[in-house]
């Protein structure tokens, strides 16, 4: 459940393996620091699962976005920009409840990232 290196394999799309791996590792590092900062290990199992699912989905979106844009990007800046509007990127178009959970996690992640600057 806690973000880990195996997530980078889930996020690979095969277009630019080197860039996908680089951005994926950066995202995992950010998500791990956020996990610690949020003290999620001391939260309920369901809370950890919600955060894990949202972070995993956000990571997948971020890797795809970075590769599609084909511009060198910093993972911190990419996620900061994606979460700065008060919500996260639209990932769950047909699943409003899942999108709300993602948005909640993204708001907290934004606070964490903004605090890091």
Model region roles, listed by residue range:
Residues 1-117:
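Charge-rich, intrinsically disordered N-terminal extensions
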């Amino acid at each position: 459940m806690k973000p880990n290196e195996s997530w980078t394999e889930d996020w690979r799309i095969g277009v630019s393996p080197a860039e996908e791996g680089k951005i994926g590792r950066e995202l995992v590092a950010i998500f791990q620091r956020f996990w610690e900062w949020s003290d999620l290990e001391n939260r309920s199992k369901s809370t950890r699962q919600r955060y894990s699912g949202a972070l995993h989905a956000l990571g997948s979106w971020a890797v795809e976005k970075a590769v599609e844009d084909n511009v060198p990007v910093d993972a911190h800046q990419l996620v900061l920009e994606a979460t700065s509007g008060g919500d996260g990127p639209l990932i769950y178009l047909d699943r409003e409840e899942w999108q709300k959970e993602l948005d909640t996690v993204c708001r907290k992640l934004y606070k964490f990232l903004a605090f890091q600057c």
